[in-house]
Structure formats: C-alpha cells, structure tokens
C-alpha cells in the first residue's frame, strides 16, 4: 500500500506543477497590485483503490471509482476513460465514475495499465477537472509452474571423482511476481539419481555423493524437481532431466591377452619385415587406452616391436637379417604400458604386463652373397684391350656351396670371367665417359633362379692426351691509328683433359711470328694472355688482315702443345678510336663492296620501289574513275523497292541469259496479290550491257503479260532491271498513290529525264490533258 501511495505521489507531481507555477505568479502579482479576486477553494479528483487480480473469470469486475470533489451526485457530470485498454479491457460508468474490468487479465502479459480520466460538465460540455493519469495494477496469483529454460541439460564429470564434486547447476524460472509473497520462490529436490548425486535445495547445484567407475556404468540420468511457494501445499512444480556422463581416467593398465606367442620368420626376409602381431587389452578408452610395446634390452638386437596406434597392436619386425645356418630360433620378452599416465594415477601402473615370444627361423635356398655391398675400380684411359680392372667375389651361403657364375649387365666395354676377374674389352677414353656404372650379377650354377646383383663403379683415370686450344673463337680488330703497346685482345685456353688445381697453360708466339714487328704477346700467368701492338699505325688498304700463330702448351706429363691462329682485322675507327663499328665494316668489305657502291645500290632500290608504288596508285585511280559510286553491289539482277516488300515476286529474279537467247518461250501466269504500296527507283546506267533490241523485246513481253493478266492487282508497279549498273542520276519516281490527287501533280519533269523516259512522259502527259 505504501508503494502504491508513493507511485500516486510521483505521478501527481507533473499535474500539480502548473498549479504551483500559477500560485507563484499570483504571489508575484500580489506584490505589484492589490488583490481583486475572491478566495478560491482548491478542487481535485477523489478515488479509492486501483488493483485488480489476474485471471478473474467474471465478465465484469469492479476495480474502483473515479470521482471529482465537485460532483454532488446529481448526475450533472460525465466521466470518460482514455488510454490503452480503455473501452476494450476497462470501462467506466459515465455517471458514477466506477471502473470495471471486462476481460480476464494476465499479469505475466501486462502488469500495469496507465489510463487517463476526464470529467465534463454535461450542461456546458467543458472539462470540470484537468485530465489526470492513474495506474491500474494487476495483482499476481500463483498460476505459473516453474520451468527449466536451458533444457536439455548434459554434464560430463571424471570417473572416480571425490564426494562433493560439482557436476552442473540447473536453474528454473517462475513467471509469477517475485515480490508478491512466495509465488516465485523455488525449492529444488532430487527425484532420481540417488545415491550417486545430490542437489542443493535453493541453488539447484548438483554434486557427487559417492565415487563412480566408468567401466561399470558410463552415464546416469538424474531428475530434478523445482517447486514454487517454497514447497508449501498448493505449490506448482516442474521437472527436468540431466544426462551425466562419466569421462575416462587412466585407472587401468594394459594386460596381454596371451602369455606366450609363437611366430616364424624366413631367413630370406629383409630387415623391416613384419613377422607377426601381439595384442594387449585396456578397459580405458581414448588416449588412456593408447599403449607402447617394447622388447627388453637383452632381446632387442635382432627384433623390434612397433605400436600400431590405430589398432593398439604390437607389430614384431625384423631388425637384423637372420641366418638359419647360424641360429634357427629366438626367444624374446615383450612388455606393454600406457602411453599417457598422469602422475596422480601412477599407483595403478606400478608393474608393466609382459609376455614371451618364440620365433622360429625357416630355412630357404639363399642367393649368392657378395663379399662387399659394391665395388669401385680404377683404370687409366687408352689402356689396351684385355687390361686387368679388378676382381669381385661371391659365395653361396647355403651348406651345399654351389659354384657361382658372374656376368656384367649391358656392358660392351668390360668383360668378366667365372673367377670374377674384370678386364677391358675396348679402349677407354675419359673425355667420352669418365665413370661407368655397371651391375655385376652372380648366379648359382645349379639353381639359376638364385641371383644376386651389386653395383660396380669403374673410374677412368686421365692421361694427358689432349693439347690445349682457344676457349672460343676470337674476332680481333685493330685501328689504323693504334699506337704501340695497345692491348687489342685477351685470350684464354681450355683443355679437354681432366682439370686439376695445378693445371697451367703457357702462351707464346710461333717462331715465324716472333720476328713479326707488328704484334706481340704477354702471358699473364693465370691461363690467359694479352695481344699488344708492336708498332704505331696500320694501313687498311695495304694490309687489311694479319694472321698470328700462337703456341699454347700445358704442364701435363708429357706436355702437349698446339698451334692456334688468331686473325686480326685492320679497321678504320675514325677519330674516336673505337672498334665497335668494325664488325659491320668487315661484313661489307668481305662482300667486296665499297661504301659508295652500297649507297648507290640503296638509291636504285628506292627508285624502283617508288616507281612500283606510283604505278599501282595510277591503276587504282583509274578504277575509281570508272566506278565513282559504290553505294550498291554489282549483281546480275538488281531489284530495288522503296516499299515494305512485294511478296514472293520480289525474290523471283530473271535469268539474264534468257534475254540473250534467240527464242523466248513464256507462259502466262496469274499474278499474286501484293500490297498497294508502290515505290519506284530509277538508276543510272553506264551505257554498258546488252543492246537495246534485247531489252525492247523483253519489255514488250512483260507489257503483254501485264495487259492480258486477268488477276493483276488494281495498281501499277515499276520494276527496274539493270545490267552491271551502279545507279541513276535521274532520282526516284514518286508512287502514283503518294499524290493527293492527279490535279495537284505535274509530270512535266518527265520530259527532262531523257529518251529512256519518253514513253512514260507521253503516258502521263496525255492523261493530264484528257483530265483537263
């Protein structure tokens, strides 16, 4: 009730503020002038409670009364109710001011209604009191059961968790008013889940009551009930289910299924071969069930175990090849342990599970065995045929010791005999092939299926059998104005023999060129040399080319020397002294032409091309004069209409060959109906084509057909035929229907179109005269 009075006071402040302002203004005015008005008594609204319970089933429920203190009960005032819900949810008695609720209300949908009230004097129609707001509050009743809004609930908790471990918290919600008594105060209880779980009554927190083992049961269903009104009689309740799953912890160690495993292995099996599998089981799941298999150190020389992490099996593999003749059985001990073991769970894994594995070696017929995995031999090049290279050896590892035969796979350079001795079958050249990669095959004599192969590498050693030579072809030029001591070329040499660090070349001029005073050579002692001029000035006309013989020797044993010729061209370098243009001049001079001759040849070529272009241009201009207009294509038959088509007859062209034939046979046929739109077009004729007799005969035949055709349409049409023509200067004739009347049209201009239109001019001229 106190809250309601406070709310009324706060809502009434805005309504009283104008009155307070008016009072203040009145007091201010009293200071300035004497009071003239009578003392007024303050009036206002009078009402009692404004509460209505929700879910009232009566059709009309009285809420309270609005009344003005000016109302003396003579029914002279009219009360009106305004705002949301007025007239639909709430009504007011216009005479008494009583307010009624005409609908069932639900506080959870709307708990407050703010309305406005007016009181009007019926006689004057004016408001007696200022419009006022008031609040109707819907009272709450316990009509909503608690609901769990976050369903479904699911929680995961580790197995073997201690008592009191928090699992999950469930929360229910009640739509009733929490400030109205105990309607929304909830109490939680456990309907299903004992004795492993418990729930706190006020918070809904679920906790573990006793330890649980996932291997016995991995999930539990717990049912929680929530009651409002703190569980008092008449309270409403709601329930929810919680699925609680136990997560696995590594509280179980792996154990072998068998205490003894028997496996076999062939002595021919290569290393890495899988011999068999062993298996242990673990009640845990996930990474807690991942295992690591191993072999005790004393037995791990020949065999090993790897773990297949997908199947959790131990795969026994061959670590080292076995020999039946040396040892035909083995015994090893394997153990298994978990891969992930937390420190707090080490008490469950103090001792690893073990098993014993017996492995039997199976005897097989083995191929020959070489003493070495590969052989490397060396031989000098240019050795004679049949020279010794080396010896390979293989034996039969079996007890019967079968004889061995040797062979070299795809080799035409080397031979091998039954003793494994390798010799050359051809001469060797290191510059052709420095290494030979071969394959030696050993085969048992009594069992040719037993074959072994190993690689054989033969290196051909170098001897000094190639003389040095120029590393490239040199184009050397010297200017006519070159001075003495000028470097004109740097040369280097190569040797096809094997390159060594101390490989060195020596450069000298030949005995014949030593006395030559034009050029000299200086050895740079780094396998290069420079060519220098030995005089000042050269003459291109007298001595255009010099040939110098250069001796290049190596430091091999024995030393080899070669003679190489360097060609030096004399070049007119001009004032710049540069030899960049010497190559072009050399090409010109090699053709035997001087510069003046080449210029003359170029001028002649330009004149010839100019004459050709001029001739082509004149021919093109003549063609343009013969055919000045190209507005249309040349055709054998040309039909042109200015109307929108004349039907199928537009596509029927005549054959010009028929016009030129001596005998013309034509059949009369009915003309198809065409549109009445007529256009005509005259064309220019270049006075070329068949003679007029042919056209005259053709036109007369067409005229005869038109005059005798009973199905001809009632309009004229003009068809123009041209022979290789390009148009007419006369222009287009107007359609006969384009004129408004014959009286408005003058056809005198037809007389100006020439003799070709004379007949047409006579026809229209006579028609005009007859009309006149």
From Swiss-Prot:
The keyword Transmembrane applies. It is found in: Cell membrane. Residues 44-148, 149-256, 257-370, 371-470, 470-581 form the Cadherin domain. Residues 44-596 are extracellular. Pfam families: CADH_Y-type_LIR, Cadherin. Expressed in many tissues, with the exception of uterus. Gene3D superfamilies: Cadherins, TCF3-CBD (Catenin binding domain). Residues 618-772 are cytoplasmic. Its main location: membrane. Cadherins are calcium-dependent cell adhesion proteins. They preferentially interact with themselves in a homophilic manner in connecting cells; cadherins may thus contribute to the sorting of heterogeneous cell types. This is Cadherin-19. It comes from Homo sapiens.
């Amino acid at each position: 009730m106190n809250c309601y009075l406070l709310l009324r006071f706060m809502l009434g402040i805005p309504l009283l503020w104008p009155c307070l302002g008016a009072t203040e203004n009145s007091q201010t005015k009293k200071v300035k002038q004497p009071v003239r008005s009578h003392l007024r008594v303050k009036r206002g609204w009078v009402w009692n409670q404004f509460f209505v319970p929700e879910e009232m089933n009566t059709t009309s429920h009285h809420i309270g009364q609005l009344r003005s203190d000016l109302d003396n009960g003579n029914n002279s005032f009219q009360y009106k109710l305004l705002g949301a819900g007025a007239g639909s949810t709430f009504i007011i008695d216009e005479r008494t001011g009583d307010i009624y609720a005409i609908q069932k209300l639900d506080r959870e949908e709307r708990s407050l209604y703010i309305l406005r009230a007016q009181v009007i004097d019926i006689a004057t129609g004016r408001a007696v009191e200022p419009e006022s707001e008031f609040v109707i509050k819907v009272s709450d009743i316990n009509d909503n059961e608690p609901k769990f809004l976050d369903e479904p609930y699911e929680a995961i908790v580790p197995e073997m968790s201690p008592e009191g471990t928090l699992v999950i918290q469930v929360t229910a919600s009640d739509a009733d008013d929490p400030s109205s008594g105990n309607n929304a105060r909830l109490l939680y209880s456990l309907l299903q889940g004992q004795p492993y779980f418990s729930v706190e009554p006020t918070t809904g927190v679920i906790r573990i009551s006793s330890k649980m083992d996932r291997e016995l049961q991995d999930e539990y269903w717990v049912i929680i009930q929530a009651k409002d009104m703190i569980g008092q009689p008449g309270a409403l309740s709601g329930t929810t289910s919680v699925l609680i799953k136990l997560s696995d912890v590594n509280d179980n160690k792996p154990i072998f299924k068998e205490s003894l495993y028997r496996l076999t292995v062939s002595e021919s099996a290569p290393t890495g071969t899988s011999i068999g599998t062993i298996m242990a089981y673990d009640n845990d799941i996930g990474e807690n069930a991942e295992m690591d298999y191993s072999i005790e150190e004393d037995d791990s020389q020949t065999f090993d175990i790897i773990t297949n992490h997908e199947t959790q099996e131990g795969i026994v593999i061959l670590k080292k090849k076995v020999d039946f003749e040396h040892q035909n059985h083995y015994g090893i001990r394997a153990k298994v342990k978990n891969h992930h073991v937390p420190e707090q769970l080490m008490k469950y894994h103090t001792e690893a599970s073990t098993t014993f594995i017996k492995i039997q070696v199976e005897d097989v017929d083995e191929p020959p065995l070489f003493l070495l995995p590969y052989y490397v031999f060396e031989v000098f090049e240019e050795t004679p045929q049949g020279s010794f290279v080396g010896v390979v050896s293989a034996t039969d590892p079996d007890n019967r010791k079968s004889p061995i035969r040797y062979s070299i796979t795809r080799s035409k350079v080397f031979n091998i005999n039954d003793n494994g001795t390798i010799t050359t079958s051809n001469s060797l050249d290191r510059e052709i092939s420095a290494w030979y990669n071969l394959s030696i095959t050993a085969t048992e004599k009594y069992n040719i299926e037993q074959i072994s192969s190993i690689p054989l590498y033969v290196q051909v050693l170098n001897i000094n059998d190639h003389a040095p030579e120029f590393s490239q072809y040199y184009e050397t030029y010297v200017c006519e104005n070159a001075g003495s001591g000028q470097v004109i070329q740097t040369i280097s040499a190569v040797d096809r023999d094997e390159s060594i660090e101390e490989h060195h070349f020596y450069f000298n001029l030949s005995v014949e060129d030593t006395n030559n005073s034009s050029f000299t050579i200086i050895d740079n002692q780094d396998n290069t040399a420079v060519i220098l001029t030995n005089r000042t000035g050269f003459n291109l006309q007298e001595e255009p080319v010099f040939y110098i013989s250069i001796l290049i020797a190596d430091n091999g044993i024995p030393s080899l020397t070669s003679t190489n010729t360097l060609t030096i061209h004399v070049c007119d370098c001009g004032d710049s002294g540069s030899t960049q243009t010497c190559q072009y001049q050399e090409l010109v001079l090699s053709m035997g032409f001087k510069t003046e001759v080449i210029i003359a040849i170029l001028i002649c070529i330009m004149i010839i091309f100019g004459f050709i272009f001029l001739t082509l241009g004149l021919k093109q201009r003549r063609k343009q004069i013969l055919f000045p207009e190209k507005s249309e294509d040349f055709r054998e038959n040309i039909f042109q209409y200015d109307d929108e088509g004349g039907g199928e007859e537009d596509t029927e062209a005549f054959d010009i060959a028929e016009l030129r034939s001596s005998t013309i046979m034509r059949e009369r046929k009915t003309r198809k109906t065409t549109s009445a739109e007529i256009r005509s077009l005259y064309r220019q004729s270049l006075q070329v084509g068949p003679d007029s007799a042919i056209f005259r005969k053709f036109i007369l035949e067409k005229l005869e057909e038109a005059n005798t055709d009973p199905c001809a349409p009632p309009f004229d049409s003009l068809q123009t035929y041209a022979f290789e023509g390009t148009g007419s200067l006369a222009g287009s004739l107007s359609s006969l229907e384009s004129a408004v009347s014959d009286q408005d049209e003058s056809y005198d201009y037809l007389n100006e179109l020439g003799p070709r239109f004379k007949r047409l001019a006579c026809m229209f001229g006579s028609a005009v005269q007859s009309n006149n």
